[in-house]
Amino acid sequence: MDAKEFREFGKAAIDYIADYLENIRDDDVLPNVEPGYLLDLLPTEMPEEPEAWKDVLGDISRVIKPGLTHWQSPHMHAYYPTSTSYPSIVGEMLASGFGVIGFSWICSPACTELEVVVMDWLAKFLKLPAHFQHASDGPGGGVIQGSASEAVLVAVLAAREQAVANYRESHPELSESEVRGRLVAYSSDQSNSCIEKAGVLAAMPIRLLPAGEDFVLRGDTLRGAIEEDVAAGRIPVICVATLGTTGTCAYDDIESLSAVCEEFKVWLHVDAAYAGGAFALEECSDLRKGLDRVDSLNFNLHKFMLVNFDCSAMWLRDANKVVDSFNVDRIYLKHKHEGQSQIPDFRHWQIPLGRRFRALKVWITFRTLGAEGLRNHVRKHIELAKQFEQLVLKDSRFELVAPRALGLVCFRPKGDNEITTQLLQRLMDRKKIYMVKAEHAGRQFLRFVVCGMDTKASDIDFAWQEIESQLTDLQAEQSLVARKSGNVGDLAQHFQIHLSTENATHEKSQ
């Protein structure tokens, strides 16, 4: 393919993407395919001769699009947002065109230095403590990782190496393997699965401590676990707290956790993958309490900041602790400017050697949308979630499981877990909206998240109509079956309602 063909192909692809995103509201959010569908549509070997790009682009519609779950759809309400925007897409395209691998400053000075700039911009935008900025006098700074999973793993591994070095210094009689065998880390039982996985990869057990009834992990619980482990001869290493848990968007008590971590010299990392975007809002300033005392934190720009996946920001109070742990160098990687404070070699801040030019799409997105545009986007998601919350509260057949938090509403139909399961399955079968379940203390519930970059109030109404109408149909079907079998009493207990009274209440609300 020459430059002329590339221009034609590229322009056609941009038109395709624009049409896709403009019309995405009209498509079912979930695909109507079965496992293995793609294997039946594609040959078993690559083509021997080049094919025309028009044929390839045509197969995007014929083969690929039918198998897509539409994450950018306004009807996507599962997980948390995985956002994008037109400026970010352009930035991704430019970065791919430049094709640089920025593992050191000399490999592409703009790649390294732009990352320094945008990470300081972002730290100021989110109102983070100044010591997390590269421009500060201290050893702190920010780096772009691929995902929250990578950021958490970096923190866990760095904390592990620091703990081993410090403990061996004060206990020289112990071998390195003996020390490593005693290490232990902590998190909440509400934390993301990536935290437990980080413990597996670090060969270090992570104790998942019980959160309170409000889903929050507090310092007293951590203190009890640390004291128990110290008494048993174990070595506490790191606590990974969460601001915005996956299940309910709960916020761990960073202030009380930081006090305990400081007392026992335990690294405190904060996973704010979702909720970090709200740091920028003055009305959400409580979320920032205690961040001046943490050692590291991460936030996914690909959730709230309209930057496409992958792009996860990580800040370190003392980057030297990571660099010292990860620095494996070779002569071919060195350059004469190494060691200058304002031009870090980010290969020492991450797991892989190579790194993408992610800062470019961040810079372009920030410049074209502006700080106020980003804040407005976060506020819009919050307001739309409030709209959905009110719809839940107005229908007495449903109940909230946790307070609404940012763009997440956790709710369930009243009754046992089977009702929640059946309702979700009906919604999944229809493919009009997409939600997932979560569970706490044996109670299953539905998570409704505002995700799309262009979600509107009408989309919230559409989703609610789907949900309440499917529950109405489910109740009617089960009522008919129960009356035929004479088990109306069992059904009422199943739903925790009296059918005739509840149906009358629902009809009145209409």
From Swiss-Prot:
Organism phylogeny: Eukaryota, Metazoa, Ecdysozoa, Arthropoda, Hexapoda
Gene: amd
N6-(pyridoxal phosphate)lysine modifications at: 303
GO MF annotation, one: structural constituent of cuticle
UniProt xrefs under Pfam families: Pyridoxal_deC
Active-site residues per Swiss-Prot or TrEMBL entry: 192
Protein name per its UniProtKB record: 3,4-dihydroxyphenylacetaldehyde synthase
EC number: 4.1.1.107
Annotated SUPFAM superfamilies: PLP-dependent transferases (SSF53383)
Record's function text: Involved in cuticle development. Probably responsible for the protein cross-linking during the development of flexible cuticles.
Swiss-Prot/TrEMBL GO biological process terms: amino acid metabolic process; carboxylic acid metabolic process; catecholamine metabolic process; chitin-based cuticle development; cuticle development
Family stated for the protein in its record: Belongs to the group II decarboxylase family.
Bridged cysteine pairs (disulfide): none
